[in-house]
Amino acid sequence: MTMLEVNGLGKAFTIHHLNKTILAVDEIQFSVHAGEFLGIIGKSGSGKSTILKSIYRTYLSDAGQIIYDSKQFGKIDLIQASEREIIFLRKNEIGYVSQFLNVMPRTTCRELVQNALLEMGETKETARIETEKALSYFEMDEGLWDSYPNTFSGGEKLRLNIAMATVKKPRLLLLDEPTASLDQQSKRKVREMIEKLKQQGTTLVGIFHDIEFMEGLCDKVFDMKSNEMSVVLEGVPHES
């Protein structure tokens, strides 16, 4: 089953003080089946993050379609979807993880994860239980659960970010360069987390600068330079 299909995606940005328009992505096309992991590769500034932010609707694309097979709405074009539909999907079906953790100050690690569930309408008791499960699952030190994230290391912030995004059990998870600026030990932990998500059957679309990190994880690779998608067989991409 095709979970996500991107057809002819285009997005441009206007730099007003230069009176100039820059084309970030153009005619992007790929598809992802349920349970697959698609890795997007390309140089800095090639538009990788623009694609993910267009899927999440942080950016509203100028052209094309982003067809998502929603459990709630059926097949829906995320570009044409209403704000109400997008909010629902973010809360219930689509998660987003970046290298940055933007959270409310003076909110503890535990509270941040619980709030993600309370927004979905879960009871306080269910939110408490599921939060503890998620933090344990991603090996967050229990001594940090009631601490503030501004004291965390980069790896600890990323674990919290992933726990917040996945505690809702999203069907589709977008990973926007989550390993940037992490040391090798933290990267290994992230890889283990992603492997756990794959085992759960989560559909993943991710951006990583480290090609070696992606080896053995991705089912498909989309190359921004060639605008082509390859199927990964025994660690080597082959054109699909």
Summary of predicted features, one role per range:
Residues Q65-F88:
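ABC ATPase NBD Q-loop/coupling interface
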Residues I41-K43:
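The feature captures the beta-strand-to-loop junction immediately N-terminal to the Walker
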Residues Y56:
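Helix-to-loop junction immediately C-terminal to a conserved catalytic motif
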Residues Y148-F152, E156:
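Conserved ABC ATPase signature
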Residues A165-T166:
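ABC ATPase C-loop
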Residues T107-L118:
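Q-loop/switch helix immediately C-terminal to the Walker
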Residues L173-D176:
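Catalytic Walker B motif of ABC-type/P-loop ATPase nucleotide-binding domains
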Residues E125-G143:
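Conserved ABC ATPase "signature" region
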